[in-house]
Amino acid sequence: MRKIYATFITLLTVLQVSAQGWPADYKGVMLQGFAWDSYSESQWSRLESQADEIADYFNLVWVPNSAYAGRMTNDMGYHPVYWFKQDCAFGTEDQLRSMIKTYKDKGVGFIADIVINHRNGIGADESWVDFPAETYKGETFQLGLSDICKDDECASNG
């Protein structure tokens, strides 16, 4: 379980979220860079093209989870299958990295909307808990049923 959490923290680092704690007197303003079913309006490339205007008014941009959701082409990021593959309904990993760099160069940060317990399996035998093994920097990670919250219906129903 520790490896999973360490991996998740690494994922956040990849997205360049590097807060050292939230300052009590923070006066910044955050823009929610997406809305439900806003796939075309919230494409990474489209948000990047608006960086000059957004950077004038906002300090942070809140974006949806960028993890790959398998066969789901229109997914708001709440059914990730692969944590380490950053291709999603909003764009590719390269587009995501380019967008983050553009905003970072203008002094704007990002917050990714990630819920660890929102995870989807690869769909073998129509199961949503057949989580794939993933390898990152030579380390392989594999979630199982024991990694689901103990009061989740899947864990309690066996």
Predicted regions and their residues:
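Bacterial N-terminal signal peptides
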Residues: 6-16
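Substrate-binding/active-site clefts of carbohydrate-active enzymes
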Residues: 21-52, 56-158
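Positively charged n-region of N-terminal signal peptides that target proteins for export
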Residues: 1-4
